[in-house]
Amino acid sequence: MQKILLIGLLAASSAFAKEPLKKETTSLQTVTAEMATAANAFLASLDAAQAKKANFSFDGDQRENWGFVPRERKGISIEELSERQISLVRDFLKTALSDTGLEKVDAIRTLEAFLAEIERKPDFRNPKAYFTSVFGEPSATGTWSWRFEGHHLALNYTIIDGKAVAATPSFFAANPGEVTQEHKLKGFRPFHAEEDFARTLATSLKAAGREVVFSETPPGEILTAEDRTVKQLDLVGIKASEMTEAQQKSLMDLVAVYAKRHRKELADADIAKVEADMANLRFGWAGGLKRGEPYYYRIQGTTFLVEVANIQNNGNHFHGVWRDSANDFGRDLLGEHVSEDHGK
């Protein structure tokens, strides 16, 4: 029922409610080739004025100018595109996201439409104010980048030599976290797994006498905010190596909820990287453990970070981000790329 309502609310952009992503097992090089093909198809559909808005230099400042709050943005918005062009954006997103990831993108835009309706602020809350940007010249063997972004959503992908993809920063959020108003969307809670898996794990750890709760008072927001670069945050909570096997599995199940927003090839690579860093992995919670109480949690490793805050609106406004302090925007991979070029 909620999925039907979700699609119905986005009828104004019907191309954003098409068939799910086909399940295919391909190499990472095929993923990057598909991204390049989709990017070039989208760019080819634009007129000169649209292309000027959508295509930027790879080396310019705009590539890392990301954010998740309502604001003016560069790129070209859904509102400025034809139905065919919107369909091409959808195809573009399919090269990176799983069916679940696509559903969450739709859910975020659905909630934006819901807020526009109940707040009566259609200019401020606009489900068509989501922008596509391409940085550099997409090719199957090249280095380039792309972003899809709007309020409560920021997807960033950097492709290096057509061989590797960096998929952070990756931000998904929902306001409200759960629709409680008398409305056809009542009960809609698109990030229930991200909340419930974490709360269940934290509750079990606390019940076992583990110091997973590092503060009774949560911070007001995710600490990394919209920073372009992030450093290792203070080590809080408990180490995964100090958990039982069942608790470690629960922690990795939670990590997988975030990773599997992306298509299998990207998700598997992210999960493998986190598993390889299990000795340094930590999980910490701040705030209340009862549903409806404001809370904050983070999972962190050597460079990996998932940070979540559900503080605003009395704990009914979900913010969650996946960061990599070494490789956001592909920095680490780009460093290797430069070193290899200099070695030739």
Task: Tell me what each language-model feature is.
Residues 8-17:
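Hydrophobic h-region of N-terminal signal peptides that target proteins for export
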Residues 1-7:
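Sec-dependent signal peptide recognition
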Residues 18-98, 102-344:
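A cross-kingdom marker for long, charged
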